[in-house]
């Protein structure tokens, strides 16, 4: 790709996402910092990502507030976290095929950056920010609803998934396995860190997770562990 997306690339992307965005803003939304640094310091998508994160949070929070008048602030926060997290955003980005349009540097390209969850999630937020900047809040809100309303509906019926750490601790206590232990590692620049967590129960690693915060990574790891332990205990009961 050159410094700008070609007209054909712009049309193809707009048809994929279902929204029109000015080519220069769209190009910026798809420009990862690795590509920018390798091409003379072009503008990156990080400012648009910052903007899109806020727009996404606002629309999802507003929807949850209006559709769940019976829930407390804490319950609403857990619902929002189940919808707005790196894994969920990356999954939506994969469904849209955003990875093939991201402008990456050679290093990121070589290490599978087009399917890296952190890059996909960041790019989706930058895209939402671009729609807001170019088309306004109404169209940005429409895009968020189209992409995330199914996740919001699923989150409302998650049960254990609203707080995987608590659910995991309850499960391990019931199975007399002891208290889960978490180990968290971080990588990336200070303003854009990625956290990776692993969880051990009774000396055995049961799950891992990745997120933009320690809390998010631990929740993802707890989810993996909860599902693994639940499956193992169900299998043991069937065999006994």
Swiss-Prot record:
Active site positions, chain numbering: 53, 125
Low complexity bias locations: 219-228
Any Pfam family matching the protein: dsrm
BP GO annotations: mRNA processing; regulation of gene expression; rRNA processing; tRNA processing
SUPFAM superfamilies in the cross-refs: dsRNA-binding domain-like, RNase III domain-like
Statement: the UniProt record of this protein carries the keyword Glycoprotein: no
Domain RNase III: 10-136
GO terms under cellular component: cytoplasm
EC category: hydrolase
Main location: cytoplasm
Keyword Metal-binding belongs to the record: yes
Region (Disordered): 205-240
Ranges for domain DRBM: 163-231
SMART domains to which the protein is assigned, alphabetical: DSRM, RIBOc
Binding-site residues for Mg(2+), renumbered to this chain: 49, 122, 125
Reaction catalyzed: Endonucleolytic cleavage to 5'-phosphomonoester
Known EC number: 3.1.26.3
GO molecular function: double-stranded RNA binding; metal ion binding; ribonuclease III activity; rRNA binding
Cellular location(s): Cytoplasm
Keywords assigned: Cytoplasm, Endonuclease, Hydrolase, Magnesium, Metal-binding, mRNA processing, Nuclease, RNA-binding, rRNA processing, rRNA-binding, tRNA processing
Quaternary data: Homodimer.
Annotated HAMAP family: RNase_III
Protein family according to the UniProt entry: Belongs to the ribonuclease III family.
Function description: Digests double-stranded RNA. Involved in the processing of primary rRNA transcript to yield the immediate precursors to the large and small rRNAs (23S and 16S). Processes some mRNAs, and tRNAs when they are encoded in the rRNA operon. Processes pre-crRNA and tracrRNA of type II CRISPR loci if present in the organism.
UniProt name for this protein: Ribonuclease 3
Provenance organism: Thermobifida fusca (strain YX)
Source taxonomy: Bacteria, Bacillati, Actinomycetota, Actinomycetes, Streptosporangiales
């Amino acid at each position: 790709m050159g410094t700008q997306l070609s007209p054909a690339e712009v049309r193809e992307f707009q048809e994929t996402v279902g929204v029109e965005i000015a080519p220069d803003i769209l190009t910026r939304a798809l420009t990862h910092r690795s590509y920018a640094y390798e091409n003379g310091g072009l503008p990156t998508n990080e400012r648009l990502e910052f903007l899109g994160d806020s727009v996404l949070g606002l629309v999802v929070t507003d929807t949850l507030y209006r559709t769940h008048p019976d829930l407390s602030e804490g319950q609403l926060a857990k619902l929002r976290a189940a919808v707005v997290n790196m894994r969920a955003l990356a999954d939506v980005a994969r469904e849209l095929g955003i990875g093939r349009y991201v402008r990456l540097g050679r290093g990121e390209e070589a290490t599978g950056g087009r399917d890296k969850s952190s890059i996909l999630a960041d790019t989706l937020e930058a895209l939402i920010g671009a729609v807001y900047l170019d088309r306004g809040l109404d169209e940005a809100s429409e895009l968020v609803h189209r992409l995330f309303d199914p996740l919001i509906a699923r989150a409302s019926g998650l049960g254990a998934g609203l707080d995987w750490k608590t659910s995991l601790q309850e499960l391990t206590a019931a199975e007399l396995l002891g208290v889960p232990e978490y180990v968290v590692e971080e990588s990336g620049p200070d303003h854009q860190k990625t956290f990776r967590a692993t969880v051990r129960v009774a000396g055995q690693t049961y799950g891992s997770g990745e997120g933009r915060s320690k809390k998010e990574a631990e929740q993802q790891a707890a989810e993996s562990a909860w599902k693994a332990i639940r499956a193992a205990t169900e299998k043991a009961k069937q065999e006994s």
